[in-house]
Amino acid sequence: MKPGIHPNYRTVVFHDTSADTYFTVGSTIATARTIERDGQTYPYVTLDISSASHPYYTGKQKEFSKEGSAARFHQRYGSFLTKKAS
């Protein structure tokens, strides 16, 4: 293989700051920050959102009604459509 063209694959600690959760996974991301975990020093990356805090994965997402967009439109603006011009 050609030297110097491959990314540096290593174990990295990702920190989801909104859920205060740490993930230790393999990655090629470049960072200058480090963290000490389990007696070893790892590269450290902070995240705003991950599967630990995203509403889709946590089940805390807003659920829309089963009616559909046309029914919601008529519910909001139906009174304007049924008014007769005077």
From Swiss-Prot:
Keyword Ribonucleoprotein: yes
GO cellular component entries: ribonucleoprotein complex; ribosome
Self-association and partners: Part of the 50S ribosomal subunit.
Keyword line: Ribonucleoprotein, Ribosomal protein
Gene3D superfamilies: Ribosomal protein L31 (4.10.830.30)
Name assigned to this protein: Large ribosomal subunit protein bL31B
GO MF terms, alphabetically ordered: structural constituent of ribosome
Family the entry assigns: Belongs to the bacterial ribosomal protein bL31 family. Type B subfamily.
Gene Ontology annotations of biological process type: translation
